[in-house]
């Protein structure tokens, strides 16, 4: 009985925390599903305070951070890199908690002006946006090095990640795939999801949902001209190339941080040693896995790479054909659906 009571108390505290987690959303249900035609719908994830889907994962992460810090009477430094939407969503999520100081590295260059202002105009003493030379990958390398060093931390401080390497981010994103399926057909038949991606976190959330029982037919991994994921699913070629600037900058990434999770779970049967060995010489050497193992991709994944010209064309097509405006990232996913006939 004591165990049951304790568990009930934990669940109650979790429910209370979750009830107060997602704030400042313009949509009552947080998410809106818009039917484009009989076979295609758009899952609108832009109704949060920064108009980024990452509001879902990062507001949940910030709530967990704050609860833990309150319990342990500690403070934390949030250290992250951004190609646009991660930084603004992280800053907005963490700015409410005095125990958290946010240091976000911003690459100088290809970023929308509104996202830059979302990060650099927050009037809070615990927010520190840092403009850095180089690309998002360069910023992310600095963050990874910071997590190795940790010498700058005080004794009562934690160092926390807000990029999608943080598992709580993925948890927050798994939820809306179940929501979409429940609202679409009450889980009665498998769905296809086309997901625009760079770092693979949102795709991995969709994959994780399938592992939890969500009926899925295919996950379409939709990328822009930075096509490392497309090359892997198409040709078993996971090799790093220079970043190409596009009109979908949140996906301008040369290496997908969350891909290692898929490799470990889907292809390598959770063999951590084999996974570590494969990554030991990357990115100097491309990752090419055993051909028989790689063939498993066809069970669940499709991929397509969309350049800027096709992105513009798809945005125009959706406006003219459906009177529906989509942003460049959504257009990448939409074009993948059109070309793959899914």
Which residues does each predicted region cover?
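Active-site/ligand-binding loops adjacent to catalytic centers
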Residues: 115-165, 225-328, 332, 336-337
